[in-house]
Amino acid sequence: MVLDRIKKVNDIKQLNEEELEELQEEIRDFLVENIAKTGGHLASNLGVIELTMALHLSFDLTRDRIIWDVGHQSYTHKILTGRKLGFVTLRQYGGMSGFPKTQEDPADAFNTGHSSTSISAGLGMAQARELTGDNYYVVSVIGDGALTGGMAYEAMNNASRMKTNFIIVLNDNQMSISENVGGMNQYLNSFRTSDAYLDLKDGVTNSLNRIPVVGERMVKRIRNAKSGIKQLFVPGMFFENMGITYLGPVDGTNIKEIRKVLAEAKRVRGPVLVHVRTIKGEGYLPAERHPARFHGTGPFDIDTGVPLYHQEKAHYTDVFSTVMRKMGEREPKVVAITAAMADGTGLKRFKNLFPERFLSLIHISEPTRRTPIS
């Protein structure tokens, strides 16, 4: 097996294209087989196998830093850094963590948790790099769910203001920021990151700024005209308008295409966002059909995807669901609030019985809901 040759960071770079194709399928099979026994986050990890491989092929994790937002999608990253054997004890006491841990491996750049922290953490590392005069890449990988958290936007706002070289990878497995516009989009991506374009852009701006009185005004008008043209062709103008260069969207199942865009991102001066479209549960049909069920799962039957529950043990979520139902029936003033996770929190039954008393947040926006409650 090709997977058996991955013992440490950068071993993946010794593989040819055929072996890389074999490896991605072996990792997919490995994850399904092992998580079926131990439980864990399956759907999200199956969706980022190719993205993670592309990141490891594009960067040197003995030096460069990759921060995974939330971190539950870092299983392939753990495999590619030589921790395959640790999956026997995944998420068990004394075993391998289901999230990045700096104590576990030097390639885990940041102890992540829930949620929306990766861009801030990456920005801090990028600033530290500038202050110490070091030379390495910093990459923050954030999902579309975590991108709904206000902290992420605060960090992007600061990144654009500081003009620090910094790469953000948007792992988009749900929302549609934009549609791929084909050849024109690819052309614009490559053109805007070419050395000739970047040098010309800086040269023209500096020259115009030196013209007395009218120079700055001319630069502003050119920028406004350029922005208007880009609105017609370039997706992700939300990020562009924040001062963050946008590249993508790119097919998250195509390692070659992801590597190509990451190479372009390395050439950008200042913050850049790479938009990667992935599919939760990719390659395992039960997880593709029911990604929410396989977001965080216990042991399950591989052939059917059906959970292997131990009937003698009561699950906390089930007990909570029953208690909430009884409280809702007994007390009409009880209101249930969840962060867009009715299934995972055991509130789906309450939602169905008392829809008018069920409030769901818009993804990662707990502060916005908790403050009015107080």
Predicted regions and their residues:
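Acidic, glycine-rich active-site loops and adjacent beta-strand->loop/helix elements
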Residues: 70-75, 142-148, 170-176, 253, ...
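Cofactor-pocket helix-loop regions in the catalytic cores of large enzyme subunits
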Residues: 19, 24-31, 40-48, 233, ...
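Short acidic, glycine/serine/threonine-rich loops at helix termini
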Residues: 76-82, 147-156, 178-183, 189, ...
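A glycine-rich helix N-cap at a beta->alpha junction
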Residues: 86-96, 161-173, 196-199, 359
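Single conserved hydrophobic/aromatic residue that forms the stacking wall/gate
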Residues: 362-374
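N-terminal amphipathic, basic-rich helices that act as targeting or association modules
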Residues: 1-79, 240, 251-259, 275-276
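Cofactor-binding active-site loop characterized by glycine-rich and histidine/acidic residues
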Residues: 41-162, 316, 327, 332-339, ...
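Long, well-ordered, tryptophan-enriched scaffold segments
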Residues: 174-320
